[in-house]
Design a protein with these regions (language model features):
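Residue-level signature of mid-helix packing/kink "hotspots" within the transmembrane helices
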Residues: 113-121, 214
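Transmembrane alpha-helix termini and helix-breaking/packing motifs in multi-pass membrane transporters
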Residues: 2-17, 214-241
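Structural signature of the two symmetry-related core transmembrane helices
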Residues: 134-149
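Helix-to-loop junctions at the C-terminal end of transmembrane segments
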Residues: 9, 118-132
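Intracellular loop-helix junctions on the cytosolic face of multi-pass helical membrane proteins
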Residues: 1-92, 96-101, 247, 252-267
Length: 267
């Protein structure tokens, strides 16, 4: 969807009507897929032989917040989403105003996404050798290296694509490992507190993704507004250009450092 959106908008006229048409097309496709899922999946309800022990909410919350590894996973998920949102959002500005070709966003994002998807498939083979935490850290170090590569030639499309591929490879272990790490935190929580709460741990950890996505989107908007960004202008001020480059180059590094620190705490 992300890769196809801008080319579709351009194809339909690159105006408000084009955005509406693109959104409607995606909505219709989503509706069709949901209907296929609804009419072709049969729910099988398994009645358990014995009713599970009901845990009071207070006791469950106390056990949750005493689980330090759940808190680390909450942070990992949140900052992972923040890094992804910042990289994806600011890249549209970068392609439009720095590379002077908004359509390049689809190429750069596709390069990162394809690399990420390929590596995610082989991560399970690497986990037994390196471990989830170490593999995640190694990948994030590669993300930092990818940003440094991009800094060597900020206006080169080739370098931007190479950097995107490296960044996709680097971030893949985090996306693949964070959910098993949350499951591990549930096992640790049961060992520590004798309270089994898989559902609450995963649900509460997902809050990190919601907060991360919201804060990062709002943060980019505030930063761009603070330097006088105006989307109606064909040419932006020098301050706006500096802000775009600053966020695009250093934003992922900032979040990568935080993620590495969290991984070091996950022992």
């Amino acid at each position: 969807v992300t890769v196809a959106t801008l080319p579709m908008v351009t194809m339909f006229g690159n105006d408000q009507r084009a955005w509406i048409i693109t959104a409607v097309i995606f909505a219709v496709i989503a509706l069709i897929l949901l209907l296929i899922c609804f009419f072709n999946i049969e729910e099988r309800v398994v009645v358990e032989a014995a009713e599970k022990e009901k845990i009071p909410v207070g006791k469950s919350l106390k056990a949750l917040f005493s689980n330090q590894y759940w808190a680390i996973c909450l942070g990992l998920w949140g900052f992972m989403v923040m890094m992804s949102t910042v990289s994806g959002t600011i890249a549209t500005y970068y392609c439009k105003y720095v590379l002077h070709n908004q359509d390049l966003y689809s190429l750069i994002y596709a390069a990162e996404l394809i690399a990420q998807c390929v590596v995610v498939l082989i991560v399970p083979k690497l986990i037994p050798k390196f471990g989830k935490r170490n593999l995640t850290m190694y990948g994030i170090f590669l993300v930092i290296a990818a940003q440094i590569v991009w800094m060597t030639s900020p206006v080169s499309v080739t370098v931007a694509v190479v950097s995107a591929v490296l960044r996709g490879i680097g971030v893949a272990p985090l996306w693949a490992c964070v959910f098993p790490m949350i499951a591990d935190s549930a096992e640790f929580g049961q060992w520590k507190t004798h309270v089994r709460q898989d559902g609450m741990i995963f649900s509460a950890a997902s809050v990190g993704s919601k907060i991360g996505g919201g804060l990062s989107s709002a943060g980019i908007g505030l930063l761009m507004t603070s330097v006088g960004y105006n989307g109606l202008l064909a040419t932006q001020s020098e301050e706006v250009m500096k802000m775009i480059k600053l966020i695009c180059m250093y934003g992922p590094i900032f979040f990568s450092v935080i993620i590495i620190v969290l991984c070091l705490l996950y022992k």
